[in-house]
Amino acid sequence: MQHFRPQLQRTLRRLGRTLLALYLLAIIGGLIADQYVQFRQSDAETQQFFANRQQPIYIGYYNTQQRQMRYIYTEDDASKPVILFIHGAPSSSSYFRDYLSDTNLRKAANLFAVDRPGYGYSGFGEPEPSIAKQAAMIAPILYQLHKQSRPVLLVAASYGTSIAARMAMDYPQLVDGLVLLAPSLAPGQEKTYDVSYVLESTFFSWAQPRMIHSANVEKLTHRQQLEAMLPYWKNITVPVTYFQGADDELIYTSNAAFAKQQLINASELNVHMLPGLGHLIAFKARPIIVPAIVNMLPKAAQYFAQRKQDVVQPQLTAVLPAATSTNRQ
C-alpha cells in the first residue's frame, strides 16, 4: 500500500499541473480572442466599407441612461420612410451592412442600424440583460425620427427580435411595422450551450472575450426576460412579417407557433418558413428578405397614416445629427 502512495501523489501532482496549465491557456486564449474577435467595425472601417461601394454613410452617437449609443445610417431624407435594423448576439450594426448597401433598400427608405447595448460601440462588453431597458435605450432614435412624421419599420434578427417586439409593445406610437428574422420570442424555445454557464462562472467570467460576455449574459437571462413580456403581446397591433429557417437548430421553430398564438392583434401576420435553411437566414436568404422588406413599407405607411397618437419627446443629451455635421464618405 505504501508503495502505491508516492505514485498516486505524483499522478495527482501531474494532473494538477495539467489542469492549471489548461486553465492558464484558456485565460490567455480568451484575452487574445478579445482583441481579435469583436464582430464590430470602427467608424473608419465602416466609412471605408461604404466608400468602396461609392455609397454615403453617416455615423452618429447619443447618450441615454448613462450610456453612449452608436448608430449608422444612409441618409435622413424626410420624404422617405425609415427602416431601423436591430442585430442579434453576438454582433453589431455591421451585421446589416449588406442591407444598408443594398440599392433597392436605399432607394426605398432611410436605412439605420444601431449597436445594441453591450456591442459594437455602445458600451462594448457592458451587457444590459433587461430587454425593456435595451428598448428604452434605442427608442430615442425613433423619437427623433418621428419628429418629421414618417413611418418606421423595424427589421431585427435573432435576439434583436426580442428587442424589436418589446419596442412595439412599449412604444406603439413609434413603430409601424416589424420584420422578424430567425425570431427568438418564446420563453425557453432556444438552444443554450452548457459552456455559457461555464464561461460566466467565477473562474472564467473575467477573462472571456467581452463580446462573448455580453452574449452569455443575455442568453442566460433571456427566458426570464421573455416571460416578463408575456402579458404584453396583445399590445402589438402593427403588421408583422416573420421569417425563419425550417432547419434552425439554435432558435427552435416552435417560435412560429408562439408568434401565431400571441400576435392576435397584429393588423397582419405573415409567417414564412424557409426550407433547407438554418439560423443565418439574414445572409443566406437576403434575395428573399430584401423584397419582403420593401413590400412591408407601404403597409407600415398605411398603419402610420391611421395612427393618431401623440408622441412625447424624452430627455436626450444628444440628438440625431444633421447630415451636414456628420462624417461622410
For the regions a language model picked out, list residue spans one by one.
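Catalytic histidine-centered segment of alpha/beta-hydrolase-like enzymes
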Residues: 277-286
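Conserved alpha/beta-hydrolase "acid-adjacent" motif
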Residues: 249-255
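Conserved acidic catalytic loop of the alpha/beta-hydrolase fold
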Residues: 135-150
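Short beta-strand/loop motif that positions the catalytic acidic residue
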Residues: 236, 242-244
